[in-house]
């Protein structure tokens, strides 16, 4: 037996020859019959003592352990005066066996008005069937929620003499729009999000275990900064002022380092008013961390340890498969300067090239450029087009030109280069980190240069933030900072090929 997608069975409306309206009408009639029989289809509570997983894990032969379990009916097999059915809860599925003679006529009459998708509570005892399946022998049944809309169910057909199970709910866009149905019928989807939660929990515990403080900073900001991106704009009516949804947390977290905290971090929703594809969502999650008295070399070692330990914690292995590639997260990761990386993968040595020379190099490589962009942006375009997709194993790309990194500290022995790295895994950026610039005079010069780039038409150039400059004028200690994209890290550790598979409710075009 194998499973495949049935092209004619993608939506709930197409699951049976009966129309959706007819099915819902029948369920509405059943709801009414239940109410007329004195059964409340939506009671307030039910006492649960065990999950399905606990029942199976703790099963003892012949013990007949009393249990109370609740969940959604996913299969029903009625055999005259007895029935088997499966309940699904957050931990999995458990089979229920029920006999009319034992639960009584009234309860069995209620059961006959139930459908796949209804949520019920069962009290009974554990046993194992003759086929060896751990089950619950029902002594009572209580309806907890009458489902009015039928859920999709897998369909088995015979194709060329072989039994084939067609997916119940496999259309990707429909899955993303109706994630609640996706979670019901596709258990592997739920596992992805459980693993996502475990990844975030492990990282949070790792940070707090080192004494760093978890904080919260503003989402609505009067000046956006900390990244090169276009913001979402809104308006505060009471203050009659324009505000922006944050594109990064960086400048506020640095203010807290100025204020005396040695390490701060924030798991945050950030927003960038840019394109949507399988690696980008306009609303995304990242964690930013800033640690005083450290630099980017220390941060690289911290990231190697963090990613390795996170993989071991959630996958029991430092090896994962992403976009068809086997990737090892075992330290140490390769380190390569951005200039050397471009030379290695394009054959072009761009060290010391002027803006005009960079444009010629890009043209030789077949890259069409916006005439408004500057040298740093040209290098970024060359790297993104010809180098980044080829970096499959974890690679720190280090030592960027100053213009590309206005918030990073200059390298002490390489003029025009800053102490910055990006971590590339599977051809995608996962982290961005600096030794943070803390000289307020140079920081002002850098931001004013960014303002000139905005005047040239670079919408992603940073804005001069006078309050941030005032903060670091009080003195910010040497500091290393990093932003880690949680969505992409989850993709890598769960083997998903789209960011929409790791976000519960991704942004989609209107229906």
Curated annotation (Swiss-Prot):
One of its GO terms (cellular component) is cytosol. It comes from Pelodictyon phaeoclathratiforme (strain DSM 5477 / BU-1). The keyword Oxidoreductase does not apply. Its EC number is 6.1.1.6. Belongs to the class-II aminoacyl-tRNA synthetase family. It is an enzyme of class 6 (ligase). Its cofactor is Mg(2+). Residues 1-21 are annotated as: Disordered. This is Lysine--tRNA ligase. Homodimer. It catalyses: tRNA(Lys) + L-lysine + ATP = L-lysyl-tRNA(Lys) + AMP + diphosphate. It is found in: Cytoplasm. Residues 9-21 have a biased composition (Polar residues). PANTHER family: LYSINE--TRNA LIGASE, CHLOROPLASTIC_MITOCHONDRIAL, LYSYL-TRNA SYNTHETASE. Binds 3 Mg(2+) ions per subunit. Mg(2+) 1 binds at residues 422, 429. Mg(2+) 2 binds at residue 429. Keywords: Aminoacyl-tRNA synthetase, ATP-binding, Cytoplasm, Ligase, Magnesium, Metal-binding, Nucleotide-binding, Protein biosynthesis. NCBIfam families: lysS_bact, PRK00484.1. Signal peptide: none annotated. One of its GO terms (molecular function) is ATP binding. One of its GO terms (biological process) is lysyl-tRNA aminoacylation.
